């Protein structure tokens, strides 16, 4: 009996003896890679819903989607684990999906914890600060959650109001540089009363709650900076204005009050608009849009959405909503809703999930499926927003089709929805740095960009150092579907060796300039680049959409790496100039901690510099 026949026989024996109790099941392939984790009230019935037995061979059921049928065809081992009840199965399923990240489970793996602005009113001179956790004090006032713009909002408060700029300022006995530039009222020297400072705090709260008033202040400041030819500062202010303007916290629900989190999941079929190359594949792929509205005191303070690429037939609605809610509420949230609103549909495990969330959040929140009234209107509002996201996402389907085409061209195991791109930059072996950019869901995710100071001299060793450091962080920052390198065959083999050493399943591609007469040549608009995979080389035409897409990623990481290289070089030049003025390394660091940049330091008077250097070090608390 061959190994394949033996595996099939063992699987048949196992199927005949499956338990009928509740629990979780796991599917593994011939390399013992976990494919899927699921829960079931009756394990035997659920597992057999995937499989048929024909001529003593296991085949996928006819009603399965192509993607799930492909998964079933890869199953060589099934593992089950019994639980006392369905609720325990639900807990265990979610835990295993989060920790093991099975290939075919829905991609709700990114842990999103939204920031809040808070103020501790038990302090005589409180400060506005950011948190993502519940703080242990009943004197804390929270504002949020903010899906984006929280940092810009906070910075705007400190730039425009005389607030205590650092925690250490209150404990000091002498006014610091912030008081000299009129940004701190100097409570350390009793130059402001608690009552007067409380009025400033009230102004800050008013600006948080009235973005229009804050934006008027910022726009006036931007125009003043521009008029004074301070264009860099004006550009920073412009970006801040744009970020705060985008914060979706202006809408009011006039017909109701209360605290609600609204979740609406909507399917989108992406297969209809695909390129011819995609039509050749027999998989009908879909995108789910998970739309979320966060409502506090009847006000929509923020909203967000997640694009979930998967096959609609592989998960039913209860599974999808269960995973979405467990993922969202798995960490403590400062301002919990009274109710979670989801659309009406048959949800047998609703009470189990509600009880689990109550235990998880230590609250009495309810999951409600409203059929009519104001709460139903909130669901319709979320649905309307999801439709708009669908419209925008449909416009981006060319990128999706390009990803599918790249997958098929390079024979990748999955569509590379998440891509990390790497490049190094140096000048004659000095200021050696590397950059990693991240592309997900049709966009560059700048919050996930990473810069690396490299300590090796040649480009090959620098790439090795950077990739190894990234791979060693997979536990805290999960790997993408694809690595794209600026290089060739040597870089691909290097990356594959590193990935193998950490046991990560990541595809690797490389793109490099074609060489003419031993020199890399690339003319604008006529780029001669070679794309390489593990086993093949592709010389695509300059107008090929796949090549242009990968070039866009390569150019972005090149820009990011060289910008960091120039920054390091300029910083060293400025540091050398300061050293030439007989300041020590420690003094330069101390000055930069206070002034924030060399540019600000240049404009400081000698008296201000001497004042900073004469102060004893105090660490923030």
Curated annotation (Swiss-Prot):
Domain UVR residues, every copy: 212-247
Cell compartment(s), UniProt: Cytoplasm
Main location: cytoplasm
UniProt entry tagged with the keyword Cytoplasm: yes
Molecular-function GO terms, alphabetical: DNA binding; excinuclease ABC activity
Keyword S-adenosyl-L-methionine appears in the UniProt entry: no
CC terms in the record's Gene Ontology section: cytoplasm; excinuclease repair complex
SUPFAM superfamilies named among the record's database cross-references: C-terminal UvrC-binding domain of UvrB (SSF46600), GIY-YIG endonuclease (SSF82771), RuvA domain 2-like (SSF47781)
SS bonds (residue pairs): none
Residue span, GIY-YIG domain: 20-106
UniProtKB keywords: Cytoplasm, DNA damage, DNA excision, DNA repair, Excision nuclease, SOS response
Pfam families according to UniProt: GIY-YIG (PF01541), UVR (PF02151), UvrC_RNaseH (PF22920), UvrC_RNaseH_dom (PF08459)
GO biological process, one term: SOS response
Record family assignment: Belongs to the UvrC family.
PANTHER family given in the database record: UVRABC SYSTEM PROTEIN C, UVRC/OXIDOREDUCTASE
Free-text function comment from the UniProt entry: The UvrABC repair system catalyzes the recognition and processing of DNA lesions. UvrC both incises the 5' and 3' sides of the lesion. The N-terminal half is responsible for the 3' incision and the C-terminal half is responsible for the 5' incision.
Subunit structure: Interacts with UvrB in an incision complex.
Name recorded for this polypeptide: UvrABC system protein C
Annotated organism of origin: Helicobacter hepaticus (strain ATCC 51449 / 3B1)
Gene: uvrC
